[in-house]
Amino acid sequence: MRTGSSEPGMGRLGWTAGRGCGVRMHDPVMRHFATITVIGRDKTGVVARITNFLFLQKANIEALEEQVTRGQFSMTVQTSWKDCDLDRNAVGRGLGELAAELEMEIKIRFTEPRRRQRMALMATREPHCLERILGAIKSGALKKADPALVLSNRRELEPRARASRLPFVHIPWEDRARAEQQALRVLDEHEIDFIVLARFMKILSPNFVWRFKNKIINIHPSLLPSFPGPQAYRQAYEQGVKIIGVSAHFVTMNLDEGPIIAQDCFAVRPQMTLKQIVAAGQKLEAATLLKAVKLYLHKRLDVHWGTVKEV
């Protein structure tokens, strides 16, 4: 299996070794933060092996979350090092050896607070959300984002990506496993930090989602948890609801059940047609998705026990 970094500016595993623990008078408490992800078939002792290795590497474990679903193991570890304790070569080499021994995929992503976040946009064919995000990029409203590419299972939105001078990647999605493998390879090559689903109309597998835990933002056309699924506007219209809304949320392995980041709604006027409802909803979708992306980029979201708190 493999181990590597997806953080721009940091390179792949195999960084310059630590410089020793001499006292640095100008910054005596400088720390480096990283996220480690572990994915593979479940087996005994994985958590112990990883945490013991991090202890030997003088890492401080800030948070750890692991789960097993249908025999598939995933773990995310938030770690930090004092500047003088971090030997990137040793950490990278050790994680690579553990990945091979455990037959798992292990990745480490270092976080640089001042670096812009590499963003991938995924969309299918509806342009309204993608155009709103691209417009915000052009106007400078998303200065903390570093837009890297637009990825789609169709080609309708390619001209819009090209007009914004972003690479457009087309991946057919008839075979989900193969498509996701290709998409993950592209995202890794572009060193993506987080993903925005601007009306991407394909369901992502747990194998994909686990690699970007709380780093995939989706917009859904209903006030979740009401009306999940692809026909939310029609369901709301047929049931005669008086208020219709949209929800931006993190993507999890359970469809439309991820932690909710932001919501907005509008009143349904008498005699309003389904077409009019969809048009009004799409405006809210674009605005609410952009709001969620801004909150994420400004690190104002705290996810705890499946809920999001704005900080």
Where are the language model's segments positioned?
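Adenosine-nucleotide cofactor-binding segment
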Residues: 162-190
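A conserved regulatory-domain signal marking ACT and ACT-like small-molecule sensing domains
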Residues: 26-117
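Histidine-anchored nucleotide/phosphate-binding helix
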Residues: 128-141
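Short, glycine-rich nucleotide/cofactor-binding loops
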Residues: 119-129
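Short internal beta-strands
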Residues: 145-156
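Donor/substrate-binding cores of folate-linked one-carbon enzymes
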Residues: 175, 179-181, 190-311
